[in-house]
Amino acid sequence: MIKTSFLAAFVSATVASLASASDLNLNIQTHMLNHVEVGPGQPIGYTITGELSDNASDGLAMFAFDLSWGGGFLGQADVPVADPMKRFANPEGLNNPAGFGGTPKNGRLFQIGGAQNTINNTVAPVPNGTVLTNVAQHGSPVILATGQFTTSYRCGTYTLAATNLFANVIRQGETGTPFWHVDPCGAGTIQNLVIDVHAIKPNVPTVSVSAHQQQVLRLNAGPNNAGRQYLVLGSLSGTSPGTTQNGVHVPLNVDSYFNFTLNNPNSAILVQSMGVLDSTGRGSAAFRPDATFQNMTANHAFILLNPTTFVSEPESCVVVP
């Protein structure tokens, strides 16, 4: 329904063949990466790059896709202000009524993108631009859309994913007289952006008792939790099925070490296990095992107190002699 609302005229008036001339590939990244680990409540900027699979056309004429983010609110993508993308956005191009950045609905963005003025419209106010050729040709990818979101305050893995991609390309050799013929473009590969939200970052995975080593646990509960009290807990018997503390599931199994960390905060074994997060929601603790921990794997996680509304993921530490 949404697709036909703003592109029907372009598709029906200028597409003469149902055979796909090229495929459009998408790549969603942040800082040129498709998979990153960040803390809770962190702002993330993303780019969505498009590239045609070959040079069998004269470039992109129209594109649209949906975007979903499993980690919370997703606002509209940015309105383009420079070429080539401003040729695809109102008023130079044509996009859906909600804007080039997509229609927000049920936590998703529907139909990000737009079309160039391939019908050479001069009657209606929109579209009123001139067509750019060779947009997103193979070997010359372009940024189709940019935007921002904030990571979840619940630790886990989330994906910014594009779906329902459809596009047209300008037929090779076209001059724009009387209009620009376009051909269907297939949906190519889509590389989504995967975000791991972690609240603990250990400095090392293994410590030696004889070398008097320690594992420093850098805590990050996000800026909304600044100034709150935290408690680091531990277990020597794994993370599943875990237990419940003050109504919140904690991914640590109850054993003697768990009870020790619960009832003896700030011990010589788990230094600074209870404290107050700083103005950015960060803190630190340190695991300093003695000989009784040799050849064991300790797991640690932290919760926030009063009330207990936040729990981190577990992080492990292998203790060697």
What are these regions (language model features)?
Residues A21-P205, Q229, R288-P321:
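Acidic, low-complexity intrinsically disordered segments
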